Amino acid sequence: MPHTEEFDVIVIGAGHAGCEAALAAARLGCQTLLLTLNLDRIGWQPCNPAVGGPAKSQLAHEVDALGGEIGKMADRTYLQKRVLNASRGPAVWALRAQTDKREYAAVIKQVLEQQPNLRLREGMVTDLLIGPNDEVQGVTTYFGSSFRAKAVILTTGTFLGGCIWVGNKSMPAGRAGEFAAVGLTETLQRLGFETDRLKTGTPARVDKRSVDYSRLEPQPGDPEVRWFSFDPEAWVEREQLPCYLTRTTAETHKLIRDNLHLTPVYGGYIDAKGPRYCPSIEDKIVRFADKESHQIFIEPEGRDIPELYIQGFSTGLPEDLQLALLQTLPGLEDCVMLRPAYAVEYDYLPATQCLPTLMTRRVEGLFSAGQLNGTTGYEEAAAQGIVAGINAARFVQGQDAIVFPREGSYIGTLIDDLCTKDLREPYRVLTSRSEYRLLLRADNADQRMTPLGREIGLIDDRRWALFEQKQARIAAEQTRLTQQRVKEHDPVGQAIAQQTQAPIKGSATLADLLRRPNFHYIDLEAHGLGDPSLAIAEKEGAEIAIKYAGYLQRQQAQVDQVVRQSQRPLPVDLDYSAITSMRLEAREKLARFRPLTLGQASRIGGVNPADINALLIWLEVQERQRSQVETALVR
């Protein structure tokens, strides 16, 4: 009988979901094993080495506010940072960091190795140990090792049945240079899980020494660096590197159109769906045929790495055509290609088979997170990873699971979409996916998530003290701004009236001034009316709370109204086929996905408001009949 080691939680896969899951479980006191195919590729960024961007930055901030790691990693290893959408409202402000991929992987590996309760091990999991009551009991590896655990988290990324394509040539691989994981897909199918195929891709890398930078448009980082983490201990001031911008040409487009038949998608070699919001260059040329040019960003992969990432230029063209294609771009006429672009096709588990806790519906104690659930992006993976890690630990410890409501965070929006929508293409989080984005801003992620992180046990005393001090300073500044007044005839009052093209009648509070269009806290500071002792985040927090107070209150009222109705639980044994007043499609969808609440039911594709109304009426009729029976029995 082979020796079997025992743990509380086992995490399979050490990408961005696996790292967050393992750290969360270990920090919550569980003996945790993190199994990976390659100990030298932990926390690797195989595509664009970057963190953040629209909606993704909100996820990174939220993970950090809960006690996770991705934001700290970006703050420690960035090459460049920029705030996107800075000229628009705070709901869509987005911090983005270009990171050093080797440094990022080295730092996260060090964090994992130094984490108490966590052990790392190299191995390929091929089978799950399942108990008599459909509960997970552990895993076995390709070479026959067994590990027991009460909870297992699958975070296998693109490695299940992974196959990479360059033109019409393919090979089994989870990503370039790393073999695919075999056996686990068949295990999941045997257990009754539905699996399907998705694809993604990554562009070529070119030698930075072969590029003519004089023909590129520099894209410098912001002079004032912003941070993903709310913990100043993670902040590292460092020199920033520029990125660059070029554009496709008519020659680029012609070369692609002439050779579309040689790509794996247009040549018919694969039919898996790729990411809608990160299309290949050939998809762009086909879908936007009237567009004469597309922006292409040239981004460094590291301080000591000669490779440049060609963002927006992923392709499935054969390798011998890729260099010619790259050399049609201004500035890259003499470039040297170091790695070809490729597409990767892989197995995934549609996440409608998961509860909102990310535990699977079929097997108790089995959790699924990250790209395996059909998402794309490191931030989406990290968000799911920390949720799975938290809930796996709570499952092992006999505590109630944590469900993140969609109105409370982008994490909640992401997971609710995954668990209720029949998604058949890689899912990317977007600000437009949230109905409550004015409330779910990056700047207040700590206000929304850190109290929960503290309650769960991931926020220590030092972090909690930092949080309380920050909130107290914001509240005090709001009070000052609503009380301090500027008089009409004061020199500063006259200067502000001239600047804003609006008179001050008698006097106005600083809060009144902040409510004026295009007048901000930085303008108060210019007139000597700010508080120089406050941090930027505290100044912005006070300004946003005042400037957008009416909008925030209205949206919060909408949330409160929706929550009252949407959180109404649905019976787990509800027979949807009996609700004949509902359309057949809606009955079938509800029976298939088994939503836990009325809110979840309303967001399932194929279920419309009339169906929800019919469901409500049916529930009320059933409740009334039950009440009448109970009353009759009492009599």
UniProtKB/Swiss-Prot annotation:
Q: Which residues bind NAD(+)?
A: 274-288
- Which SUPFAM superfamilies does the UniProt entry name for this protein? FAD/NAD(P)-binding domain
Q: Which InterPro entries match?
A: FAD/NAD-bd_sf, GIDA_C_N, MnmG, MnmG-rel, MnmG-rel_CS, MnmG_C, MnmG_C_subdom, MnmG_C_subdom_sf
Compartments in which it is found: Cytoplasm
The record's GO molecular-function terms, alphabetically, read: flavin adenine dinucleotide binding
Could you say which residues bind FAD here? Answer: 13-18
Q: Which cofactors?
A: FAD
Origin: domain of life: Bacteria
Stretches of the chain forming a coiled coil according to its record: none
Provide the leader sequence positions.
none
* UniProt keyword Cell membrane present: no
Q: Which GO terms describe its biological process?
A: tRNA methylation; tRNA wobble uridine modification
Which GO cellular component does the record give, naming just one? cytoplasm
The entry's keywords = Cytoplasm, FAD, Flavoprotein, NAD, tRNA processing
The record, for NCBIfam families, names: mnmG_gidA
Q: Which family does it belong to?
A: Belongs to the MnmG family.
Assembly with partners or alone: Homodimer. Heterotetramer of two MnmE and two MnmG subunits.
Function per UniProt: NAD-binding protein involved in the addition of a carboxymethylaminomethyl (cmnm) group at the wobble position (U34) of certain tRNAs, forming tRNA-cmnm(5)s(2)U34.
Question: Which PANTHER family does the record match to this protein?
Answer: GLUCOSE INHIBITED DIVISION PROTEIN A, PROTEIN MTO1 HOMOLOG, MITOCHONDRIAL
Q: What is this protein called?
A: tRNA uridine 5-carboxymethylaminomethyl modification enzyme MnmG
